[in-house]
């Protein structure tokens, strides 16, 4: 996200700074989760390669079989952990997309047993829960504020820059002259 984009949308500098600060926090959290995910992927691939190495070197079959079973178990655990993290990241991301003010509070109110990925990798069961939660506990979510009318500084409207309108200063000077 770039400051110029937000400025072009008509946001003032304070609003842009606030948005950029929150965006920076979200990106740090996202990068931390990505690093953790990558570490789990690396662990999973290392365990898979160790399993293959043990299969190739079958000097002591019984001991190697035990090691293979242990590595398979470790690999399954790492895969489960990776999938759980992937699901957690997707849930957190979707909660933020729904405009939650506090993702942890919203996440605590969800039934995680009903949330899962389908065969195409899409989340199932989360959107309905978030919609019903947004209806019942709307205070947890940011309001969608419609764009309001601009404030008029003058009762006849704001003067047009470079227009024929006489400035307020000139009107006061004319009134004082008589």
Curated annotation (Swiss-Prot):
Single biological process term from Gene Ontology: viral capsid assembly
A Pfam family per the record: Phage_scaffold
InterPro entries for the chain: SCAF (IPR009636)
Assembly description: Homodimer.
Protein family membership: Belongs to the SPP1-like scaffolding protein family.
Functional note: Scaffolding protein involved in the icosahedric procapsid assembly. Coassembles with the capsid proteins to form the procapsid, in which the scaffolding protein is found within the external shell of icosahedrally arranged capsid protein subunits. In a subsequent step the scaffolding protein molecules are released from the procapsid.
Protein's UniProt name: Capsid assembly scaffolding protein
